[in-house]
A protein has these predicted regions:
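Double-stranded beta-helix
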Residues: 17, 206-270
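A short secondary-structure junction signal
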Residues: 176-181, 198-199, 209-215, 224-228, ...
């Protein structure tokens, strides 16, 4: 399958993408420890960590109910079509949305619509700073304790999440003999913003091949050295070759899981939305964590072409050049 890296504009000679495999998370947790030493070693080696049922089930279910209500009020459907509803799974497959407006050319929402809908994906960015999502993920004591144990105590105060991302099932028949069914949906990419630590929290159960978040294990080590600076978006001339190497050589893993599971990953990881062959909706909240330091203003981000209002990942005013130790400044349980 031909590689297209969505956030980097890579479209060159075809690369055969590897099919993803469903990840089986090892039980490395230790009672009373936000992150065990075994989990730290796993994160350093692989670039991600799955914390099972980190968020209380009741809180997650309440958040999903509020998300459904917001979705029903805010996402327009094509004329004459049925909107998805939480109590009727027959309405979930291949929804038909109304035409999406162009993003604003200026102002606080410059460059990205407040709600993105197209194909089988809806991104409720505008919901990202809602109190119930802030309390559920970046400001949740257990979530923040994990982020502090991995990255550091001095985290930048969280201002928003990226919102809720929903991946809807496909109404079309899938040929079980088509090998492309496990590679075609993958869109490996990295994000063009300041990146240190990210989190993905599931708002509902995500079965295998149900659109689970997908990463390329170990790619954080390769992509870290494809940048000039440790955290700021600063690709070197060999950046695109590094992405192509990751996609060609690394087998991606897909995260199936339960509501309340949270996946933490290093910000330089190559990642993708997952393969969705099922009949459920994958609901997830995405959040960003960085150490607390002076960052550029919104206008400065716009001037350098790195303004992404829906991400809580601001470019540092000063950032260290990439050196031998990619974990310089990270706590890593110490």
């Amino acid at each position: 399958m031909e590689l297209t890296v969505a956030r980097t504009g890579v479209e060159r000679s075809p690369i055969e993408k590897k099919p993803s495999v469903v990840f089986e998370a090892p039980d490395l947790a230790r009672p009373g420890e936000p992150v065990s030493s075994e989990e730290i070693r796993f994160f350093v080696d692989n670039g991600f960590l799955v914390k099972k049922r980190l968020i209380d089930k009741t809180a997650v279910e309440e958040a999903l109910g509020k998300t459904w209500a917001y979705f029903g009020d805010q996402v327009p459907m094509a004329e004459g079509t049925t909107a998805p509803t939480p109590d009727d799974a027959s309405t979930w497959a291949s929804p038909e949305w109304a035409p999406m407006p162009r993003p604003d050319d200026s102002g606080p929402y410059q460059g990205r619509q407040r709600i993105v809908y197209g194909g089988h994906t809806v991104k409720l960015h505008d919901l990202g700073d809602a109190d119930f999502l802030m309390d559920l993920v970046p400001n949740h004591p257990r979530v923040r304790a994990v982020a502090q144990a991995i990255l550091g105590d001095d985290l930048r105060p969280s201002e928003r999440t990226r919102g809720v991302y929903a991946v809807f099932p496909n109404a079309g028949e899938v040929d079980p003999d088509d090998p492309g069914r496990l590679t075609r949906p993958l869109g490996p990419h990295t994000d063009q913003v300041c990146q240190q630590l990210n989190a993905c929290a599931y708002l509902d159960d995500v079965p295998p091949r149900g659109g689970g978040f997908t990463v390329y294990p170990g790619s954080h080590k390769i992509m870290f050295r494809a940048h000039r600076f440790e955290a700021n978006w600063s690709p070197l001339p060999d950046f695109r070759d590094a992405v192509r190497r990751v996609v060609a050589e690394i087998e991606p893993v897909e995260f199936a899981g339960d509501k309340g599971d949270v996946i933490f990953w290093h910000g330089r990881m190559v990642h993708s939305s997952g393969v969705h062959l099922g009949d459920s909706i994958r609901w997830a909240v995405f959040a960003d964590f960085t150490l607390d330091g002076e960052v550029l203003s919104a206008e400065e981000h716009k001037r350098i072409g790195q303004f992404e209002w829906f991400k809580d990942a601001k470019r540092f005013a000063e950032d260290a050049p990439v050196g031998e130790d990619m974990w310089r400044g990270w706590r890593l349980g110490r």
